[in-house]
Regions:
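Substrate-gating cap/lid region and adjacent catalytic-acid/histidine neighborhood
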Residues: 241-242, 246, 277-380
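Serine-hydrolase-like catalytic core of hydrolytic proteins
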Residues: 2-4, 10, 96, 101-271, ...
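Cleavable N-terminal signal peptides
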Residues: 4-5, 16
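Non-catalytic accessory segments of hydrolases
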Residues: 10-182, 203, 297-299, 338-339, ...
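Accessory cap/linker subdomain of secreted extracellular hydrolases
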Residues: 73, 258-295
């Protein structure tokens, strides 16, 4: 009862008003939220949610590099709610719904949006651009609300990028080079560089940071000539360019693409014909087929960046040996308790072990889970 009273009291003191900011593509209207501050006056954060940084990657733009968004001038774009998250497994809901209390996740192939949180749009503050993790197959801006970080005096940008086959399908040649999701990230960084000054951010003080696959993405941007001009510092959390999940050989990616093609009745030795057939399938059918692919994740992830001679010119090992990377301040770290949020979902979903972990992991549960996990891996 006390916690409910405190919650109602805090909410009653929130003040919300609209704010409009200009970009190269037109004006954007977001919301300013003021929060109580025990040590002084209210603190405010301007939120601009669901801002398009690229054209919808649908139709002819599926399996293609992102293109800039179309200008919406003289209209004003409403940026008061999150944009749809990219198509992915609904497994994400098991992990995040209990934490962020989002009633519904909206999934769409049209998902190249970013969220901006600014403590003051009239200043020139450092900028932090967050790249979410999720094994290149799940995640989105809605899972990373950043009011608290913005209140520390930085402009925070959360970007989205295509996932799974939509972001990383490859044949190893010009039929499907791959890395569309990484190029989405580059396009988002370019958008930030061109527009963030109007949101109170300094385009000359941009730090990119991310966790897990977001961390490896950050490290790959340090190696990529496509993105080097758009950031100045980097933080890679629980993932770097040499992590086992960071990239995959092109031959492995081609094998996954061929398996996807078989499931969609698109099998062909002609890569162009195969990709064209997949391209013409419904997005929901592609996603469903991709989720049915099973790989041994002790080797590589199903979908991941590859050497495409565009975003990634050579393997990370080769580029590092040559010293061909952006030399900037870099923090590499791990994330404490990063698996804690997933434990409950895994316990109730994996191997039929429906046991509450509210009071911790019992010795019986641990031994049973370990035995079943080992058996599952041995039987692959």
């Amino acid at each position: 009862m006390l916690s409910a009273t405190l919650f109602i009291f805090c909410v009653s003191w929130l003040h919300v008003r609209a704010e409009t900011v200009s970009t190269r593509y037109g004006d954007i209207e977001g919301l300013v939220t003021s929060y109580p501050n025990v040590s002084g006056p209210f603190k405010s954060v301007s939120k601009f949610l669901g801002v398009p940084f690229a054209a919808p990657p649908t139709g002819e733009l599926r399996f293609k590099a992102p293109q800039p968004p179309k200008a919406w001038k003289p209209k004003v774009h409403s940026a008061k709610t999150h944009g749809s998250i990219c198509l992915q497994s609904k497994l994400i809901e098991l992990f995040f719904k209990p934490v962020i209390m989002t009633p519904n996740f909206n999934y769409s192939e049209d998902c190249l949006y970013l969220d901006i949180y600014s403590p003051n749009t009239s200043l020139s503050l450092p900028v932090m651009v967050y790249i979410h993790g999720g094994g290149y197959i799940v995640g989105g801006a809605v899972t990373s609300p950043s009011d608290i970080l913005a209140l520390q005096g930085v402009v925070v940008v959360i970007i989205q990028y295509r996932l799974g086959p939509f972001g990383f399908l490859t044949t190893g040649d010009s039929a499907a080079p791959g890395n569309y999701g990484m190029l989405d990230q580059v396009q988002a960084l370019k958008w930030v560089s061109e527009n963030i000054a109007n949101f109170g951010g300094n385009p000359s003080k941009v730090t990119i940071f991310g966790q897990s696959a977001g961390g490896s993405s950050v490290a790959l941007h340090v190696l990529s000539p496509r993105s080097r001009d758009f950031f100045h510092q980097a933080i890679a959390e629980s993932g770097v360019e040499l992590s086992s999940f960071a990239t995959q050989p092109t031959s492995f990616g081609l094998g996954i693409t061929k398996e996807l093609a078989q499931k969609l009745n698109c099998g062909s030795n002609d890569h162009y014909a195969m990709v064209s057939c997949i391209h013409n399938k419904r997005a929901s059918d592609i996603q469903k087929a991709a989720e049915s692919i099973r790989v041994d994740h002790s080797t590589y992830l199903s979908w991941a960046p590859v050497v495409d001679k565009n975003f990634l010119l050579e393997t990370p090992q080769s580029l590092k040996m040559k010293g061909d990377f952006k030399q900037i301040p870099l923090i590499i770290s791990f994330t404490s308790n990063e698996g804690a949020m997933a434990v409950g979902a895994l316990a109730s979903d994996s191997f039929g072990l429906n046991e509450s972990l509210d009071d911790g992991v019992s010795p019986t549960f641990f031994k049973t889970y370990l035995a079943k996990f080992a058996h599952a891996r041995d039987s692959r």
